[in-house]
């Protein structure tokens, strides 16, 4: 506020889809320029922009516990998860992805995480106690 600026988010599409973020913390910045990029695309962008390899190649981690990395906790690498997420978002089914040659265990891992963390990508339900409750059906008053 002192600088008249807004904080930027650093979350990416892979983390959001896999549910690997803190709910209502790193998923709720006012601006998130990387939010529609998969993790592997963020790495590609960083290389394109000249970010040093020592930063890009550092294993992704929430840095909450020493020597614990994202991919260890997820059970799959972003390099394997991102193509699966991409094709699921394009409308392919789990069975189609499995029959396409992708690892069945990888597809199952991604699908389980995607399904189990869907609730994290929804707005909270508001108890509608009045006709002016601010929830999913809220309409902004018209400015005259």
Where does each model-flagged region fall?
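ATP/NTP-dependent adenylation/nucleotidyl-transfer catalytic domains that generate, transfer
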Residues: 1-144
């Amino acid at each position: 506020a002192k600088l008249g600026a807004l904080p930027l988010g650093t979350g990416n599409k892979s983390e959001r889809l896999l549910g690997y973020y803190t709910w209502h913390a790193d998923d709720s910045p006012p601006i998130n320029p990387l939010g529609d990029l998969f993790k592997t695309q963020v790495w590609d962008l960083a290389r394109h922009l000249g970010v040093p390899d020592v930063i890009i190649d550092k294993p992704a981690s929430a840095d909450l516990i020493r020597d614990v990395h994202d991919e260890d906790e997820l059970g799959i690498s972003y390099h394997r998860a991102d193509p699966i997420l991409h094709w699921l978002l394009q409308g392919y089914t789990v069975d189609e992805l499995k029959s396409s040659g992708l690892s069945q265990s990888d597809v199952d891992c991604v699908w389980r995480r995607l399904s189990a963390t869907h609730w994290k990508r929804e707005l909270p339900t508001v108890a509608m106690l009045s006709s002016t409750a601010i929830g999913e059906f809220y309409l902004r008053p018209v400015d005259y």
